[in-house]
A protein has these predicted regions:
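Well-structured core secondary-structure elements of compact alpha/beta domains
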Residues: 1-34, 47-73, 95-138, 152-177
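Soluble sensory domains of the PAS superfamily and closely related sensory modules
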Residues: 74-81
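Short acidic-hydrophobic surface loop/beta-edge motif
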Residues: 83-89
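Short, Gly/Ser/Thr-enriched beta-strand-loop segments that form substrate-interacting elements
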Residues: 184
Length: 184
């Protein structure tokens, strides 16, 4: 078994890219309001591959199983024929439609769009991570300190960068359980 610590930096997304995503989501909302099928639009345009092929459907979920921003809007939806306002989550930007509520669980469908990140922003993010790695190697600060102060990953920064194993609710992983991008 292994434990994994990570430091995450998000690349800067140009405002024009965010505005383009929001414009497209407003267009999809207008189309649904004019009678087009939300499910069909999700199949065609959503960038959530897992739910897109199911018409954007996310099975019954409790509030804690969803991104907090998504859950906040989704749990306040009342009318299944209405489309939510645009929601920004850690995954991108969504519009949401309520399918059904059962007690403290909801079933929704959504369309997710992610802003395009230019190559230069990715390169700048990589350079920043390389600089942090050099500072750690040169003992300017420990990995734990860097993760706590510099990481932008909300799930790990308050735990010194320790990656949680969602299968066991611990920080320990079998090698085959590691996400492929980490197991390399």
């Amino acid at each position: 078994q292994v434990e994994v610590q990570i430091i995450t930096q998000q690349p800067k997304v140009p405002l024009e890219e965010i505005e383009d995503v929001k414009r497209r989501l407003r267009e999809y909302t207008d189309r649904v309001n004019k009678g087009e099928s939300f499910s069909m639009l999700a199949r065609l345009y959503s960038e959530d591959r897992g739910s897109a092929m199911r018409g954007g459907e996310i099975e019954f979920s409790g509030r804690g199983m969803l991104d907090p921003a998504y859950a906040n809007v989704a749990f306040n939806l009342q009318d299944p024929s209405k489309v939510s306002k645009i929601v920004e989550s850690e995954y991108g930007f969504h519009i949401i439609q309520l399918i059904e509520k059962r007690g403290d669980r909801i079933k929704t469908r959504h369309i997710l769009l992610k802003p395009h990140i230019p190559e230069e922003a990715l390169a700048a993010g990589c350079a920043r991570l390389d600089s942090i790695a050099d500072d750690i190697r040169n003992n300017k600060f420990s990995f734990e300190e860097a993760a706590s102060v510099l990481s932008q990953d909300k799930d790990t920064r308050n735990n010194h960068g320790l990656l949680p194993n969602p299968n066991t609710n611990t920080s320990r992983f079998e090698m085959q359980e590691l996400p492929p991008e980490i197991a390399k």
